[in-house]
Regions:
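Catalytic domains of lipid- and phosphate-ester/thioester hydrolases
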Residues: 1-132
Length: 132
């Protein structure tokens, strides 16, 4: 039984987690992930772990051919903070009056929404789906 615990730390932690998971998984020829029962952690580490897990699923479904490719690490390390920094400096003045609908529910667009949009763009929408 394998339990993976990731640490927080923003985009560096996301990249580190992604790199470590790729290395362990490639070295063990996928056996480590087959025996993984729990992936837990915080912040950037969980983003990296979620992205890697999504890549594994995409490979199993035949959507991608090789989850170990370098460009996946490059994707997760792309800038996600410029848009957020702009929103923080403008104090969400213009953004808070915008909303979006998801599955019949209306949500206010905020920094979290902007972060999610940038993450989806950076990772080619691989994480852009409902969990239910």
């Amino acid at each position: 039984m394998v339990i993976i615990n990731t640490s927080g730390g923003g985009s560096r932690s996301a990249l580190w987690t992604m790199t470590v998971l790729q290395s362990i998984d490639e070295t063990t020829k996928g056996k480590a992930l087959q025996h993984t029962q729990l992936i837990t952690g915080a912040s950037g580490g969980m983003i990296g772990a979620s992205y890697y897990r999504a890549l594994v699923l995409e490979e199993q479904l035949g959507q991608i051919s090789n989850r170990f490719e370098k460009h996946y690490r490059e994707n997760i390390s792309k800038d996600m903070l410029n848009k957020l920094a702009f929103m923080a400096t403008t104090n969400d003045i213009f953004i808070r009056y915008q909303s979006t609908k998801v599955n019949g529910y209306t949500y206010t667009k905020d920094r979290g929404f902007a972060f999610e949009q940038q993450l989806n763009k950076n990772t080619n929408n691989i994480l852009n789906h409902s969990l239910s």
